[in-house]
Amino acid sequence: MIKREFLPESAELKIKLTADSKKWAEFYQKAEQKQAAKVSLRGFRKGKVPLEKARAYLNPQAVFELALRMFLPELEKQAATNIIDSDNVIESPIFNIVNMDKNNLEIEFLYPVYPEIKLPDYKNLKTKFAIKKITKEDIELQKQKLLEAKGRFIEVNRPVKIGDVINFNFKGFIDDEPFDGGEGENFDLRIGSNSFIAGFEEQLVGLEIKKEADIYVTFPENYQVHTYANKKARFRVRINKIKENQPAKLTNEFVASLKIQNVETISQLEVYLENLTERENIERAKIDFQRNALTEIGEQVEVPLAKKLINLEIERLNEVFHSTLKQQEIPLKEYLKITKFTEKDIYDQFEVEAKKLLKNSFIFAEIAKLEGLVPTQQEYESHVEKLAKFTGKSVQEISETVSYNEIQINITNQKVIDKLIEFNHEAKDEEIVNKNQNDNEIEQDKEQKDNNEEKIKQENNLENK
């Protein structure tokens, strides 16, 4: 007997089977015989103990599990014949045993299906795509960063200022007790880089070489070591060295030395930096819009998620996590010791993140379906070429290592964001949005611009270290 049932609250198709009792009995007997062959009794050669005598030594649970494992492929195939296209099944099933004894087996397969989603009015979001207006101060800041990156650091004997690179020792205390990971010696820090928790670097300003001082901070609520979150801490610090930056001089000769195509004078550099800043502002606006728009939509929609999909996503996140630890040569035990996490804490985090990622992926998919957003072959090939250029691999290598489906999803998701921007942007950004919708015209001459901008960004990154 076969029974189908759609479970909208968990986005699953349940197919319940009552197995043929004769077949199940045959598989059970085969499992008994296989398990009996492992039994050793005095007076019998191994594997030659009669089944009647071996039964007393068998683990019934092991017999049932083996019988089910042998029968399962046939049962799953039988269940699959009862799936139709309109069910929108998107993954292989998990199964539950309803009833199982020597003579009877009832089993249900739970197939993940595309969930029922009722989206809010995503064409009229409160979140708006807005691009920050470029000011003269922005251009001056870009120039200053570039000059500082090309400058040099010299040791000075004066109190610490914003922008200095200091070498210092520190030791942290919570409730007047030292804590793991709270101590360091000869640590280099760029003041103003916000590398430490809020309030730490600001209190270093004004300190002098070889003098000790206490700094008081509160760990943030989302601090990676959760046992320290929201805790007040005191750091005893000692400044060893102070270096200040002497920026390069802005001259036409300096500009020419940057070797940026068609940029040889100060005025040309300013125009170039203005274009660079505009592009950075657009990308930053896209990132902010995507995050806030998805949050707004997500708060107004429930997306049922099948257990199988959640488990698969947790497995993927776990694989990435362990791969990252391996690359950084950090044993799991050491990581747990440093962060004060348990393996259950990590699993719980993965579960929350998995549900969030799956929910967002279905929101993307539903909007793409409603708006008819389908990647073209040209878009696919262009995306592969960009990935190849970015990673330094050949187009063939990218095609072989990154799945077609993964690339299609990436392209579709970007088309969804572009469509949401088209629906939800401020009037002042109309021209830029229109360009973006016309094959991303804002990326004209992109290859040369990317090369030039990468030089600037690398210089600015050096300045921030």
From Swiss-Prot:
Domain PPIase FKBP-type: start-end pairs: 163-248
Keywords attached to this entry: Cell cycle, Cell division, Chaperone, Cytoplasm, Isomerase, Rotamase
Catalytic activity: [protein]-peptidylproline (omega=180) = [protein]-peptidylproline (omega=0)
E.C. code: 5.2.1.8
Alphabetized InterPro entries for the sequence: PPIase_dom_sf (IPR046357), PPIase_FKBP_dom (IPR001179), Trig_fac (IPR005215), Trigger_fac_C (IPR008880), Trigger_fac_C_sf (IPR037041), Trigger_fac_ribosome-bd_bac (IPR008881), Trigger_fac_ribosome-bd_sf (IPR036611), Trigger_fact/SurA_dom_sf (IPR027304)
Disordered, as annotated region: 431-465
Positions with biased composition (Basic and acidic residues): 443-465
Cellular component GO terms held in the UniProt record: cytoplasm
GO BP term (any one): protein transport
Subcellular location, record wording: Cytoplasm
Molecular function GO terms recorded: peptidyl-prolyl cis-trans isomerase activity
Top-tier EC class: isomerase
Protein purpose: Involved in protein export. Acts as a chaperone by maintaining the newly synthesized protein in an open conformation. Functions as a peptidyl-prolyl cis-trans isomerase.
Domain notes: Consists of 3 domains; the N-terminus binds the ribosome, the middle domain has PPIase activity, while the C-terminus has intrinsic chaperone activity on its own.
Family: Belongs to the FKBP-type PPIase family. Tig subfamily.
Name the UniProt record assigns to this protein: Trigger factor
Record organism: Mesomycoplasma hyopneumoniae (strain J / ATCC 25934 / NCTC 10110) (Mycoplasma hyopneumoniae)
